[in-house]
UniProtKB/Swiss-Prot annotation:
This is Acyl-CoA-binding protein homolog 3. One of its GO terms (molecular function) is fatty-acyl-CoA binding. One of its GO terms (biological process) is lipid storage. The gene is acbp-3. Coiled coil: none annotated. GO terms for cellular component: cytoplasm. Belongs to the ACBP family. Keywords: Lipid-binding, Transport. Residues 3-92 form the ACB domain. An acyl-CoA binds at Y34, S35, L36, F37, K38, K60, Y79. CDD domains: ACBP. Binds medium- and long-chain acyl-CoA esters with very high affinity and may function as an intracellular carrier of acyl-CoA esters. SUPFAM superfamilies: Acyl-CoA binding protein.
Length: 116
């Protein structure tokens, strides 16, 4: 399986995670996944920094800007690693196998694709 296919599977997992519940992503995790996704998909920041009153957009832009110079492939690898690390941490507190039976089956399939 190619890096792009693994990355696409990881992105789909994040997109399909329930918004609430035991495996909801924190704001910091969302910011990490956002910035890595942008770097992996587009590369270095290609827009102006949002204004001071656009707090959320500015945080997202700053997080992406911090990845400047990271290759798109490296960003994809980091995205997949961040997802794997997140599930490792979740597994310390939750029976992930049982949880996976209750949610979108695509998540379970895609976790297997990325080596989880």
């Amino acid at each position: 399986m190619s890096l792009q296919e693994k990355f696409d599977a990881a992105v789909e997992i994040i997109q399909k995670l329930p918004k609430t519940g035991p495996v909801a992503t924190s704001n910091d995790q969302k910011l990490t996944f956002y910035s890595l996704f942008k770097q992996a998909s587009i590369g270095d920041v290609n827009t102006d920094r949002p204004g001071i009153f656009s707090i959320i957009e500015r945080k997202k832009w700053d997080s992406w800007k911090e990845l400047e110079g990271v290759s798109q492939d490296e960003a994809k690898e980091r995205y997949i690693k961040a997802l794997n690390d997140m599930f490792d941490k979740i597994a310390e507190e939750l029976d992930v196998a049982a949880w996976l039976e209750q949610i979108d089956p695509v998540i379970k399939t895609n976790l297997a694709l990325i080596g989880k």
